[in-house]
From Swiss-Prot:
CDD domains referenced in this protein's UniProt entry, alphabetically: bHLH_AtIND_like (cd11454)
Compositionally biased spans, kind Basic residues: 183-192
Annotated region described as Helix-loop-helix motif, given as residue ranges: 286-321
Keyword Nucleus: yes
Subcellular location: Nucleus
Region (Basic motif): 272-285
Protein name listed in UniProt: Transcription factor RSL2
Domain bHLH residues, every copy: 272-321
Record keyword Transcription regulation present: yes
Gene from which the chain derives: RSL2
Length: 352
């Protein structure tokens, strides 16, 4: 390998003209066999030396010489190369190890080159690297680094976005929890206020109902007291009416306890009256109530609706009893007593 490297350096540095290189290569390669044919051959050269192609092959080295307008390719059509400047250039590919029982075939499938251009001679020439047979695509190092940087920046941006979202979500949750607590406190306060208002309303309604009941009871008692009459003689009734009228007028004018009784308050709360008028009126009311009880039990099958009807029925009943007593006490008319008892008028007027 060292010998071939020296030859390549000598060829690249010493022989600059096409004719001298052709003569030298004819003499040099006369003793070597072509790797594909097994015989020693030179090269195919044109008259103007534009199609010159030299191939120096062995088990370990590979040397190629290309003319000004020519081009060459590596084995198995792995890559292509084009030269655009003047002069001849030599290219020495990398060394490939080979087994003893196999022939040397240089393949670019297993070699990966990340560069797109080679600096040869005075000027630069570009080598367009195509896809290899293995399906891999070569990319320049700068683009790979840029892509890697772009991916890292994208990852960092995503991480920052997720962190900001999580922070905003936590803030929103905390705000939502605080607002929920405030709402619950307000609802509880409103419920308590409503309960208190309903309790107050219920108490007020109960008090109003009690006062209404008391007023009704007092009104009924007053109506009974006003409608009560006495079953005394006309003189006693007139006296009682006069006394009652005078008492009522005097009590309305002088005694304010009656007004309090109309409002539902009892007189016992203010103490018992000791004046003679109030004592007389109390005795009179008690006597009237006793006579009303006797009247209710006296008339059979009475209506007991109001005191006026009760009095009328009592009067008719008393007249009926007087007639029956008259008929039964006479010797001539006793037979008419049952007829008069059944309600038939026989023309006998009851005595007055």
């Amino acid at each position: 390998m060292e010998a071939m490297g020296e030859w390549s350096n000598n060829l690249g540095g010493m022989y600059t003209y096409a004719t001298e290189e052709a003569d030298f290569m004819n003499q040099l390669l006369a003793s070597y066999d072509h790797p594909g044919t097994g015989s020693s051959s030179g090269a195919a050269a044109s008259g103007d030396h534009q199609g010159l192609y030299w191939n120096l092959g062995s088990h370990h080295n590979h040397l190629s010489l290309v003319s000004e307008a020519g081009s060459f390719c590596f084995s198995q059509e792995s890559s292509s190369y084009s030269a655009g400047n003047s002069g001849y250039y030599t290219v020495v590919p990398p060394t490939v190890e080979e087994n003893q029982n196999e022939t040397m075939d240089f393949g670019m499938e297993d070699v990966t080159i990340n560069t797109n251009s080679y600096l040869v001679g005075e000027e630069t020439s570009e080598c367009d690297v195509e896809k290899y047979s293995s399906g891999k695509t070569l990319m320049p190092l700068e683009t790979v680094v840029e892509n890697h940087d772009d991916e890292e920046s994208l990852l960092q941006s995503e991480i920052s976005v997720t962190t900001t979202k999580s922070l905003t979500g936590s803030k929103k949750r905390s705000r939502a929890t605080s607002t929920d607590k405030n709402k619950r406190a307000r609802v509880n306060k409103r419920a308590q206020k409503n309960v208190e208002m309903s309790g107050d309303n219920n108490e007020g309604e109960e008090e109003e109902g009690e006062t209404k009941l008391k007023k009704r009871k007092n009104g009924a008692m007053m109506s009974r007291q006003n409608s009560s009459t006495t079953f005394c003689t006309e003189e006693e009734s007139n006296c009682a009416d006069q006394d009652g009228g005078g008492e009522d007028s005097s009590s309305k004018e002088d005694d304010p306890s009656k007004a309090l009784n109309l409002n539902g308050k009892t007189r016992a709360s203010r103490g018992a009256a000791t004046d003679p008028q109030s004592l007389y009126a109390r005795k009179r009311r008690e006597r009237i109530n006793e006579r009303l009880r006797i009247l209710q039990n006296l008339v059979p099958n009475g209506t007991k609706v109001d005191i006026s009807t009760m009095l009328e029925e009592a009067v008719h009943y008393v007249k009926f009893l007087q007639l029956q007593i008259k008929l039964l006490s006479s010797d001539d008319l006793w037979m008419y007593a049952p007829i008069a008892f059944n309600g038939m008028d026989i023309g006998l007027s009851s005595p007055r």
